[in-house]
Amino acid sequence: MAAKLVSLDMQARTALIKGLDTVADTVKITLGPKGRNVVLEKKFGAPVITNDGVTIAKEIDLEDPFENMGAQLVKEVASKTNDVAGDGTTTATVLAQALVHEGMKHVVAGANPMYVKRGIEKAVEKVVEELKKIAKPVETKQDIAHVAAISANNDEEIGNLIAEAMDKVGKDGVITVEESQGITTTLELVEGMQFDRGYLSAYMITDPERMEAVLEEPYILITDKKISAVSEILPILERVVQTGKPLVIIAEDVEGEALATLVVNKLRGVLQSLAVKAPGFGDRRKAMLQDIAILTGGQFISEETGIKLENVTLDMLGRAEKVRANKDKTTIIGGKGNKKDIEARIAQIKKQLEETDSEFDREKLQERLAKLAGGVAVIKVGAATEVELKEKKHRIEDALSATKAAVEEGIVPGGGVALIRTIKALDDIKVDNEDERIGVEIVRRSLDVPLKLIANNAGKEGSIIAEKVKEMDGPMGYDAARDRFVNMFDAGIVDPCKVTRSALQNAASIAALVLTTEGLVAEKPEKEKQTPPPPPEY
């Protein structure tokens, strides 16, 4: 078994703080509208330029194992905040550093770390309560544009793009970010329900110029069976022919004589039809087919439901205004399902979303939700070089997360003002002893640090700016981009409440751990064995 290194007391805490400071000092130069960028070396390809706290933190590993533990703890603050709120990682890192430094002075002076920790927790709880009171809901497209622009490093073009996308697909819609071949960033909208399966035969095309099959007012047969014998679908084909409407078949597969019959009838002008494979795999496929059935007001025909294809009647088929398919994709537009059924299905998927721990499942459920709720918007990111493209894509993804957080819990004044406005609420906290009061004071002194840093990065004296803001009321604060004092809501300088709240909660959680640490144990690095010289040649 490998030997271990052990460090205790002050020595342990000093090493932890040194590692923590290394990461925090690198991250904090990016805070605010005039924050700088950090360039990250990549083993392969061009370096990455970013001002995103979590991306920078994740790249840092230190040689000293004890210092590296401190660095890893800060990474945890940043990545946890990123997971919960999608932004605010730099603020979280800066707050963690401030809380640790303030707290360490008192712990070294003899305060009981466990009581200090309890004081910090009480103070954070009070601040979060106060933030929720200050927060106001996101109501207008303009609010969304402001939140997105600030998160994307004050890029108004990105802000407007995300506001436009959210306006089009609604709050439950899915917005995806993809790389574009050109140099401009554009927004594309996919209306209706789209899935990645195209027509099974090119003979089904109705628009040769665009290589698309477009069917107006079709009946839709939805099944998870493989259809190869024409006898299985003949009864329903005859019923649909009598209505004079086209037929869309969504099945595991349509092959052999069944497919041939559909093609021949299409060519002869007897029945316009379209066959596509069912989307997804396994249980996810069944869930998606049920979604389509609910959206179109049809029934999902399956062995499990006990309905045979031969017994399918017209009222079991779905309806839609239009179905469009090319070789890769099928889109169902204007499904004629019952609104209440669709809403119940949406509520069911939302419930599953709350309960799942898997990131992959969450993504897939979110996609299904969007397809039922109103569509998908795709932001295609363009840039002149690959380095710029990656940096821009990263900013858009950040802005998107922040915007979703803002919609969830509302917005608070940005630029560090919201945290300062909660300071007065700390006067009301009841503490059990002096050390708990110290914990509350530590939080009080740390709450103005983000604002000071924003001002410092803008070339101003942070302490002076912070004092001026404390003398003001409500949403009044400092606009570092234009060097003026303004109403933050009116100027559009806002942060999602969820981002500010998560940043403080995660910072306090790690700071409390560091303050109550007395010992560190790490692997002893093995000395590299010298390779023996090669044998002499004879």
UniProtKB/Swiss-Prot annotation:
Gene Ontology CC annotations of this record = GroEL-GroES complex
Principal cellular location given in the protein's record:
cytoplasm
Give me the reactions it catalyses.
ATP + H2O + a folded polypeptide = ADP + phosphate + an unfolded polypeptide
The answer to whether UniProt assigns keyword Protein biosynthesis to this entry is no
UniProt-recorded Gene Ontology molecular function terms: ATP binding; ATP-dependent protein folding chaperone; isomerase activity; unfolded protein binding
Q: Where in the cell is it found?
A: Cytoplasm
Enzyme Commission designation: 5.6.1.7
Q: Which CDD domains match?
A: GroEL
Q: Which Gene3D superfamilies match?
A: GroEL, GroEL-like equatorial domain, TCP-1-like chaperonin intermediate domain
What GO terms describe the biological role, i.e. biological process, of this protein? chaperone cofactor-dependent protein refolding; protein refolding; response to heat
Sorted alphabetically, which keywords does the UniProt record give? ATP-binding, Chaperone, Cytoplasm, Isomerase, Nucleotide-binding
- Coiled-coil portions: none
Positions of ATP binding: T30, L31, G32, P33, D87, G88, T89, T90, T91, G415, D479, A480, A481, D495
S-S bonds:
none
What the entry lists under HAMAP family is as follows: CH60
Its quaternary organisation is: Forms a cylinder of 14 subunits composed of two heptameric rings stacked back-to-back. Interacts with the co-chaperonin GroES.
Function as written in the Swiss-Prot or TrEMBL entry: Together with its co-chaperonin GroES, plays an essential role in assisting protein folding. The GroEL-GroES system forms a nano-cage that allows encapsulation of the non-native substrate proteins and provides a physical environment optimized to promote and accelerate protein folding.
Q: Which family does it belong to?
A: Belongs to the chaperonin (HSP60) family.
Q: What protein is this chain from?
A: Chaperonin GroEL
Which species does the entry assign this protein to? Dictyoglomus turgidum (strain DSM 6724 / Z-1310)
- What gene does this protein come from? groEL
